[in-house]
Structure formats: C-alpha cells, structure tokens
Amino acid sequence: MSEIKFYSEKTGKYYKLVSTSTWPYLEISGIRMHRADEVDPKKDAELKIKAIGRVYGRVLDCCTGLGYTAILLANKKSVDEVITVEKDENVIMIAKQNPYSKPLFENSKIKLIIGDAFEEIKKFEDKYFNFIVHDPPRINIAHELYSLEFYKQLYRVLKDNGRILHYVGRPGIRQGKNYIKGIIHRLRMAGFKRIKMVDYALSLIIEKV
C-alpha cells in the first residue's frame, strides 16, 4: 500500500495513513485516531465489539473514521443494518484508498452518511437503534459529542434495553478522573442509569433500562 499523506486547506489539517502489522491507523495533525501502542487498530476494533456484547438489529456508529468498527458490526449475521456517520470528507477519501476499509463501501448492510453526528442524530426517530457505538475524537477536538445535549439525543434514539459503547480512552494526568466523572455525570443527567467501565476497551458500556 502506497503512503497516503496530505494537507487540506479546507480544514487546515494534515492527514496521514500510517501502516502497522495489521490494519493502518489514521493520524490527523499529529493526533492518532486509533489505539496503536499496546494494541493495533484491528485488535482495538475487535475489543470494542467484544465489550458491547451480543449485537443485533440496527446499529448506529457515530464516528466512522476508517470504518473498522462499522465493518466488524456488519459482519455479524444478527445485525441487519449499520448506519455510520462521518463529518470529515478527507477521512472518507482516505478510507476509499485503504484496502482494509473496502467493505465500508461494498457491504450493503452499511449506510454511510457524510455529515455532523451532532446534527444528523436529530433526524432519527425515537428508539430507532438497538445499539450505538460512540467513538468520538478527543474531547478538546469535538467537545459537542461529549455534551449533555448530544447524550440526550443518544438516549432518545436508543431502544429500551439497548446498549451504547462510548470510547473514552485513557485520560492524561491533567484530565484525570474528573474527565471520566464529567462524562458519567452528563450521561446520568441524560437519563442513563447503568454505566460501567470496561478497561480492556477503554470504553464505557451504557444501558438504557
């Protein structure tokens, strides 16, 4: 696979697809969009799918990226449809050149929406999704995707007894526990009662009960 890297005047960001021993990861202006240290991007996506448990029906993938999570979800026979949303057209352009993202554009169970998840989620009906995967960029890059307003929308579009995987990463010392506490506090304010941390996936599993 030839190296993919470029600067976008429209976004003012540098984009780079970085090879690993398995699936490549995306880097935007020096910030990795995938875990690539203790686990590779392929294993990272697999751990997220494992953490959310048995999935079926219709699934929302809030931030497409290179499409790895959407692809693994759509591979499951119990999943009927994966709706995945990506704001950055440059990311989709890179995904189209990444052979490991090919099923994102070829699997008929995957519906890709080019748009802002913060706005697109408002267009879905109440209790539309059985499961949601929310893997946003860092909070300082996309703070609106960690907001109470967005969490209320997640609650609204999720079916009763549905689950959400919310990737939170491993916050630095300066953020510390207050970062996770803030997320959990806003999720509870949005209506979610059952929230647990799954360390191996660096994610919260949230149930609507």
Where are these regions (language model features)?
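S-adenosyl-L-methionine
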Residues: 87-126
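Conserved alpha-helix/loop element of class I SAM-dependent methyltransferases that forms part
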Residues: 39-57
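N-terminal auxiliary segments of SAM/dcSAM-dependent transferases
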Residues: 1-19
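A short SAM/SAH-binding and catalytic strip from SAM-dependent methyltransferases
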Residues: 130-145
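Conserved class I S-adenosyl-L-methionine
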Residues: 55-66, 83
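A short glycine-rich, Lys/Arg-flanked "PGG" loop and its adjoining helix->strand segment in the class I
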Residues: 146-163
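Class I S-adenosyl-L-methionine
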Residues: 170-209
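Conserved SAM-binding loop of SAM-dependent methyltransferases across substrates and taxa
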Residues: 66-79
